[in-house]
Amino acid sequence: MNSKVEFEENIDMEFKEVKGINSIDSILSTVDQYVVAYLNIKRNIIGKILWGISDDRTVTGVRLEYSERDKLRRDVVNKLSQISPPIPSQVYSISLVEVYDENMKVIEDKYIVEVTVHPYSSEYFFSTGKDEVYLKTDGGKRKLKTHEIQIELKSRG
């Protein structure tokens, strides 16, 4: 906790610090956007979104009690089921990674929430339940405007 991870953010790994009182709402507010962004890049990479690590690589963790962990998994699956076109559940996974203190003792109810997105081929762009289309970039994600979608489709030939 409060130590820095050795790996860095890049196109296949995104760090997210949970802000606000409600950890679940914070994660749910962007999880579908990042999953869609990974699905829409035409690279054969596995993407990871890690909630509980800040942009400066500091491990902050996400506080989740037992009932919240179950609710988080259920709510993320529900949110991702709204992606269009639909994706199989094997395309993503949700893991809770324990966080340790400086003495290497597990901190109770503190986790890194890791959502892993596997490559999935489609001739279409994926969109969120709000019909928003995103692309993953080195610095995060970018919401595409209608003309950008057309340009991107044309470039993919």
Predicted feature locations:
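Conserved N-terminal catalytic/coupling substructures associated with nucleotide/phosphate chemistry
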Residues: M1-G157
